[in-house]
Amino acid sequence: MKGFFAGLICLLTLLQPKPVNAQTDSACRFRISVLTCSPGDDLYSLFGHNALRIIDTIKRTDIIYNWGTFDFYDPDFYPKFVRGKLLYSLEPQILPGFLQEYQEEGRSVMEQVLDLSCEEKMEIKKAVDINMIGDNRFYKYDFLLDNCTTRIRDILQKNIKGINEPVPLVPAGTTFRDMIHAYLDQGSQPWSKLGIDILLGSKIDRPVTNTEAMFLPDFLMKGIDSAKVNGNSTVITKQLILDAKPRVEMQGIYKPLMIIGIICLVLFLISFLKTPAIITVIKFTDTLLVLVTGLIGLLILFMWFFTDHWSCDNNYNIAWALPTNFIAAFATWKRPQWIRKYFKVAVVLMGLLLITWFWIPQEMNIAIAPFCLYMFYRYIELSRSKKI
């Protein structure tokens, strides 16, 4: 009997779980990879996308963790979007559903399978699981500092031990604006580029760090490719799981600089023709342009002071898009004495902007230059007597 109990105790001892080893074995069942989706043709998809893929080889699950979803049917969607208060969320997806959208749009998806220790796999899975709990799924989206790419970047940096800084991903001195411009140029979006340059202020004209450069999906992929742990690559395999259709380059000739330049040149030349019809046209365009610049200035002020978009702060475009022009426009046609004094101040401000164009701490879109030159000339004329 004693032998029976001794054997039973021995058997139960052997069957006792080994917490550390079991935990390690459990963690090793995960296969973790980063998916990088190529840029699309539309502005919202122009910069690409990232997601995290976790395969559980024991439970046989294959989950895509996507930090790029939002509720388009929220009744306050547009006000929240404009004011920078829109919440994005982490959503789990299955691979076929995730790939379907990119397949329909002809975009590629690249997978980098990460070389991780069992402990690192466990910590990354734990971090994702915590992100999936309740309100943790939601975050206030920031295109430059907190997006679907930076969320993955931060999880990897926090949970991969001894990971080295990747090689320089961009040339020294590259700014956020430079990186945005590269994609807008590649995607043939000159008018979007103009609009973005008008709305985004000088805060995005500082050089980015290597970590900050990984706010864009392609640069996160490059960063992962070049990062090392104890001298070894962080990537086991890199494979194309969805091929892209060749992109058709849309090189339109109607670029903002050319269009704005031609319009301003024509207006400048015809302003010397003193026929009644031309005088009426010039007075109308003066009123219209002063009104439009005033509206743009009010929009700049709103984005600067009444939204959470930090990238719209300190916007030097307000030097030519004077918010007060919105009021001045209604007095431009008849030009009373006070409005002529107002335009003298506008002449000084526009002149200072043109003189310091290449030295102010904000890169101005070159397409604005001919417009500013023309408005400088018109402000001079409007500051004089009523005669054109």
Protein language model regions, located:
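Bacterial Sec-dependent N-terminal signal peptides
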Residues: M1-T24, K387-I388
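Internal catalytic domains of large membrane-associated glycosyltransferases
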Residues: L8, Q23-A27, V34, N136-F138
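A short, structured loop/turn motif at beta-sheet edges
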Residues: Q23-D25, D56-T61, L116-E120
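Glycine-rich catalytic cores of cysteine/serine-nucleophile enzymes that process amide/ester linkages
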Residues: C28-G106
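Extracellular structured ligand-interaction cores
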Residues: H49, D62, E111-V113, T149, ...
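A cross-kingdom signal targeting lumenal/periplasmic-facing segments of multi-pass membrane
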Residues: D71-D146, T150-I160
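Activation targets extended, charge/polar-rich intrinsically disordered C-terminal tails
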Residues: I130-F330, Q337-R340, V348-I388
